[in-house]
Amino acid sequence: MDKSNSSVVSEFVLLGLCSSQKLQLFYFCFFSVLYTVIVLGNLLIILTVTSDTSLHSPMYFLLGNLSFVDICQASFATPKMIADFLSAHETISFSGCIAQIFFIHLFTGGEMVLLVSMAYDRYVAICKPLYYVVIMSRRTCTVLVMISWAVSLVHTLSQLSFTVNLPFCGPNVVDSFFCDLPRVTKLACLDSYIIEILIVVNSGILSLSTFSLLVSSYIIILVTVWLKSSAAMAKAFSTLASHIAVVILFFGPCIFIYVWPFTISPLDKFLAIFYTVFTPVLNPIIYTLRNRDMKAAVRKIVNHYLRPRRISEMSLVVRTSFH
């Protein structure tokens, strides 16, 4: 393309999930409810884990960090998507687009590694119970969380380095509700085949390696429990089945979109909903409703803050502050 006749793209047009006005209103209500559930549900987990001393253990420490990542992951694009359902101009600036690419890879990569850390915690608890306290110390948990952020940051910066210096001087329409890296890359004013290869290698190493580690750890846990007791095996499988389902819903779309980006499909933007919205909704449900300790702690927190006497005291404080 002749640079003299080209113009630099300053913004991108996001086509969103659909163009139907009736569906736009439905999607606005639906995703508004889901986003509210994500924020409140994960904040409740963080509050419960930090305030209840009985939950100050490695498993719940990692769960609290997962809830924080889920809130961040749902917030990088969902609020704008919800606002765009009621907007006639669904655009995003170039810097805003780069920011979305940065945050989606940072939080998604962080969650992948964090899920492996949580699986490792369960592996040590079940397969090496006598050494659990020694292995899963507070320092170890902190290091695992730091590693998850470090790995995701390296992954993100390497992905961003492929995109930020690309020349965008022509088409600026992204058929998605956020700036999806494979789609944005194809809008560049040059042959992006080599860059797509680098994206595949980068994303493939992270997603496939973490997914393989997760599956391997689950298999080892199930085999270990099965060798001890068939009844315990059934209980462990019922617990892990829901975790595995969430892992598949999270990793499946990521692997399909980012490890196979050469053919862009309209289905991709709907698959992206799974790891940006549905997984952050399901994680609090899976890790709370199927855990007796968490349910008891959540019930205690809710009763403490929502009991009638507490509410009347709070309303009295509010009224007093206005006088």
Curated annotation (Swiss-Prot):
Q: Please give the InterPro entries that the UniProt record associates with this protein.
A: GPCR_Rhodpsn (IPR000276), GPCR_Rhodpsn_7TM (IPR017452), Olfact_rcpt (IPR000725), Olfactory_Receptors (IPR050427)
Its GO CC terms are: plasma membrane
Cysteine pairs bridged by disulfides in the record: C97-C189
Transmembrane annotation, as ranges: 26-49, 58-79, 101-120, 140-158, 196-219, 236-258, 270-289
How does the entry describe its membrane topology?
Multi-pass membrane protein
Pfam families tied to this protein: 7tm_4
Per UniProt, which keywords does this protein have? Cell membrane, Disulfide bond, G-protein coupled receptor, Glycoprotein, Membrane, Olfaction, Receptor, Sensory transduction, Transducer, Transmembrane, Transmembrane helix
> What residues bear carbohydrate chains?
N5
Location of this chain's protein in the cell: Cell membrane
UniProt KW Transmembrane keyword? yes
Per its UniProt record, what Gene3D superfamilies does this chain match? Rhodopsin 7-helix transmembrane proteins
Where is it predominantly found? membrane
Q: Pull the Extracellular topological domain ranges from the record.
A: 1-25, 80-100, 159-195, 259-269
UniProt keyword Ribosomal protein present: no
GO MF terms listed in the record are: G protein-coupled receptor activity; olfactory receptor activity
Q: Where are the Cytoplasmic topological domains?
A: 50-57, 121-139, 220-235, 290-323
Similarity section: Belongs to the G-protein coupled receptor 1 family.
Any idea what job this protein has? Answer: Odorant receptor.
User: What protein name applies here?
Assistant: Olfactory receptor 4K5
UniProt organism field? Homo sapiens (Human)
